[in-house]
Amino acid sequence: MAARNGGTIIDGKAFASGVRGRVASAVAGLEAAHGVVPGLAVVLVGEDPASQVYVRNKGIQTREAGMASFEHKLPAETAQAELMALIERLNADPAVHGILVQLPLPRHMDAEAVINAIDPKKDVDGFHVLNVGLLGTGQKAMVPCTPLGCLMLLRDTLGDLSGLNAVVVGRSNIVGKPMAQLLLNESCTVTIAHSRTRDLAGLCRTADILVAAVGRPRMIRGDWIKPGATVIDVGINRIEEAGRSRLVGDVDFDSAAPVAGAITPVPGGVGPMTIACLLANTLTACCRANGLPEPDFAEAGG
């Protein structure tokens, strides 16, 4: 973490590097002791430029961690039945421990049906309805990567989270809802806010933990934040400013940082944690598939 006048900047990039290092060490130990190599299959349908970048980065980091990387790139016009057949083959492949279908999918495909075709034990994104239900009932589940990364940063920053008031701004199935569930499982008092929430600013000011995942650039300002609160900014928004393109979060960092006790920047905060947690989930899936002890990455940063 880096100190700043008024608060601490949570260095997600450094923490993610620590997670990846722990994963790589565990993978090497797994191969040496048991001859097992975790395998991650990533499926990309279409030519979306952002998705291509994400898939390329995932492949690089998977291989750097010592895992097997299987990339399947399909044209945008691929029939859904063909994609389902590929998923069925990956489900049955013992060398593949994690399956990720890059979203968004082309419009003619039913994303929910595709995700739920993945074997829940290989669903390293944590989006399968079974994993959602397991998480919601406090049982062992594959946890979505971005909320898991946020939770790791919060634990590292605050230690015990029990009894803290947490406000999650955003109710998506990918971030908002699972984030709220993870915080509830940590014994926080959790409120989910969204675009219809009355007096959103006032609600945010009650939060000891404020998670912004609404997809609106710089929506949350410094005067919305309780002094000393920990702010986790999940937003990644590209804006044009002074003739240049730049990335900003859902939080107005310049006004929020002097008020917050700790805050994640954009970029360099939550973003790097997502792929690190994907690798951790893949390793976990491999250990479960082989009846081996699961590593604990709760305090893997630094």
Curated annotation (Swiss-Prot):
GO terms for biological process, alphabetical: L-histidine biosynthetic process; methionine biosynthetic process; purine nucleotide biosynthetic process; tetrahydrofolate interconversion
Binding site for NADP(+): G170, R171, S172, S195, I236
Reactions performed catalytically: (6R)-5,10-methylene-5,6,7,8-tetrahydrofolate + NADP(+) = (6R)-5,10-methenyltetrahydrofolate + NADPH; (6R)-5,10-methenyltetrahydrofolate + H2O = (6R)-10-formyltetrahydrofolate + H(+)
UniProt KW Hydrolase keyword: yes
An annotated GO cellular component: cytosol
CDD domains, sorted: NAD_bind_m-THF_DH_Cyclohyd (cd01080)
MF (Gene Ontology): methenyltetrahydrofolate cyclohydrolase activity; methylenetetrahydrofolate dehydrogenase (NADP+) activity
Pfam families reported in the protein's UniProt record: THF_DHG_CYH, THF_DHG_CYH_C
The keyword NADP is annotated on this UniProt entry: yes
Pathway note: One-carbon metabolism; tetrahydrofolate interconversion
Keyword line: Amino-acid biosynthesis, Histidine biosynthesis, Hydrolase, Methionine biosynthesis, Multifunctional enzyme, NADP, One-carbon metabolism, Oxidoreductase, Plasmid, Purine biosynthesis
Enzyme Commission number(s): 1.5.1.5, 3.5.4.9
Assembly, per entry: Homodimer.
Function of the protein: Catalyzes the oxidation of 5,10-methylenetetrahydrofolate to 5,10-methenyltetrahydrofolate and then the hydrolysis of 5,10-methenyltetrahydrofolate to 10-formyltetrahydrofolate.
Family designation: Belongs to the tetrahydrofolate dehydrogenase/cyclohydrolase family.
Name this protein carries in UniProt: Bifunctional protein FolD 2
Taxonomic source organism: Paracoccus denitrificans (strain Pd 1222)
Gene: folD2
